[in-house]
Amino acid sequence: MATTARDVMKTEVRTVSPDISLTDLEKLFIDNRVTGFPVVESERLVGIVSRSDIVRKIVTEQSYAEYVSDYYRDVGSFDEPRPADTLPELGSQIGSRLASATVRDVMSQEPVTVSADDPVSRVAEQLVKRRIHRVPVVASDGRLEGIITSLDLVGLLVDREPG
């Protein structure tokens, strides 16, 4: 009989609310020694959030701040703005926008998921194909049942190796 997601998944899953701040999220990353969490609201999976989502948000905010600062630059001036003059302003703009951001603002809203009955080969295929490190296991009604990480699959391989 083929190994299924149910055989490999962890059922004790730490989740986060979509409404917590990114500051609180970072504390949870550190405290739990992980880089991502399923996002759950009313017992249903609504997304997944990882550190790379936060980095993406920072880069987006920086690009936006640079665009706005270029737009408002005095085009009649012959003086080139120096990076030292604009960097603190950009940092302040990015910081204030990120300070009010929540998990909902950065999470992946349509995460790749599998069902508990899916073969583990499908789970591995999704991790590789989508270049992700974790996949939530969900019931047909959207409830989170567990999670499988790439390390869980590596552990499965190690356990199968002859002594």
Show where each model-derived region lies:
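Tandem CBS (Cystathionine beta-synthase) repeat/Bateman regulatory domains
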Residues: 1-163
